[in-house]
Amino acid sequence: RKINDPQVQSERQYQPFRIAQQNINGDEKLVFNVDYLNETKSLTIEQIMAMFLTKLKTIGEMNLNTKVVDCVISVPVYFTDAERRALLDSAQIAGLNCLKLMNESTAVALAYGLYHNNLPDVNEKPHIVAFVDMGYTHLQVSIVAYNKGKLRVMGTNFDNNLGGRDFDRVLMDYFQKDFKERYKIDAYSNSRARLRLRAECEKLKKLMSSNSSVIPLNIECFMN
């Protein structure tokens, strides 16, 4: 995507880091400008994703006590062909051999089918299941028909602008306004403060999900 893409512009409101566009080998790419060791570094999306995959690879090797090379990666159903190819590039940078990119709706459907042995025979009426996936940044819904040894994805839909972070954002906006009125400080004027507020609001959201009592918000060293 380019810097003027509506999806990119929508995403910028959630992120404290600086997003820019840079010509790399004749191709205009999005980069993230980050400060590292007193220098500004420009990192592509592929490079950042490769860092995550490298970390996962390291964790896997430590737990399995063996070298991890092959992998299968699940992706949202709305990923474009370009986004899928970029993810494959990230896997290659991380030293991983991606055997297959699988839609997340298909992955969860397979996982469900593997552990259910009471599915109807092939010539019988299928067992219909709806899967609702509320992720951090998106919502995905899929309807799947099951028979023994067989599944069919009947349909999928998504909203890639609705996720758990939208609940965090409501809490963040509330506390940002409250702090500004009571303490004359603006949490959104400082990137570190904004990140701290986001982290605490996410914790608060999780506590609120399972607790109906009054829950305090505690942030140490907020603006410094």
Pin down the residues of each PLM region.
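Oxyanion-binding/catalytic loops of NTP- or PPi-dependent enzymes
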Residues: 1-27, 37-51, 58-224
